Amino acid sequence: MWGSGELLVAWFLVLAAGGTTEHVYRPSRRVCTVGVSGGSISETFVQRVYQPYLTTCDGHRACSTYRTIYRTAYRIAYRHSPGLTPSRPRYACCPGWKRTNGLPGACGAAICQPPCGNEGSCIRPGRCRCPVGWQGDTCQIDVDECSTGEARCPQRCVNTVGSYWCQCWEGQSPSADGVLCLPKEGPSPVAPSPTPGVDSVVREEVYKLQARVDVLEQKLQLVLAPLHSLASRSPEHGLQDPGSLLAHSFQQLDRIDSLSEQVSFLEEQLGSCSCKKDL
């Protein structure tokens, strides 16, 4: 018994011995019947060729387009000869399709005219699938990722032909994924060498500052002492919080100040009075 590999080799040997692969086509998907009623001849024809090139589109964007040139090519044509009996049907790939990777009988490769540019792939006749960064019927237009919002640059986006890149402010560089701008790593700072006598001076300044802090804490306790006293006396006066007691105390002080002014006024009046002696 032959294996599948041996059968495939034998099949290609038969094709090579026959000198042609036209007879291996059979009516199937993307394979069409070509009626022949005469012999074949070689003829010339004018063939269109599309040459891609880069140009500038609106908005100063780079676009890939094509120019059309014409050249002389050769092809096999079939002519009907008078008096000859029509030959049996022949088969070939339908218009818009060609053989897949040179294999006979398999018409699975689509044909796009003009061809797809910028590494685009022809998925069906006249239809291209464009790679990332390109768009258009033949993948000839550059996608501006910075304007469409597809770019994920944290600070500044720079569009390029078929792609983009992120730019950070001076002193920063983009992260590996391009999402963040990180500070550039510089040389490690060198610790300054200690100067003789500086340690004792700093220690003395620390002691002075600590003494000043202690004095301020004592003054703060003196200022807060009356408030603590008011807070402890608030339940005695039926007040709910120290703030209410403080307001009540201020009212009492206002009354005392008013009485003091009245006493001072009476003292002035008494000083201006004089008693008359009886004669």
Swiss-Prot record:
Superkingdom classification of source: Eukaryota
InterPro entries: Dev_Signal_Modulators (IPR050969), EGF-like_Ca-bd_dom (IPR001881), EGF-like_dom (IPR000742), EGF_Ca-bd_CS (IPR018097), EGF_extracell (IPR013111), EMI_domain (IPR011489), NOTCH1_EGF-like (IPR049883)
Subcellular location, record wording: Secreted, Extracellular space
Residue span, EGF-like domain: 108-140, 142-182
Domain EMI: 28-109
Disulfide bonds: C32-C94, C57-C63, C93-C107, C112-C122, C116-C128, C130-C139, C146-C157, C153-C166, C168-C181
Predominant cellular place of this UniProt entry's protein: secreted
Gene3D superfamilies for this protein: Laminin
Job of this protein: Regulates vascular tubulogenesis in vivo. Inhibits platelet-derived growth factor (PDGF)-BB-induced smooth muscle cell migration and promotes endothelial cell adhesion to the extracellular matrix and angiogenesis.
Oligomeric and partner information: Interacts with ITGAV/ITGB3 in an RGD-dependent manner, increasing endothelial cell's motility.
Protein's name according to its UniProt entry: Epidermal growth factor-like protein 7
Upper classification of the organism: Eukaryota, Metazoa, Chordata, Craniata, Vertebrata
Gene: Egfl7
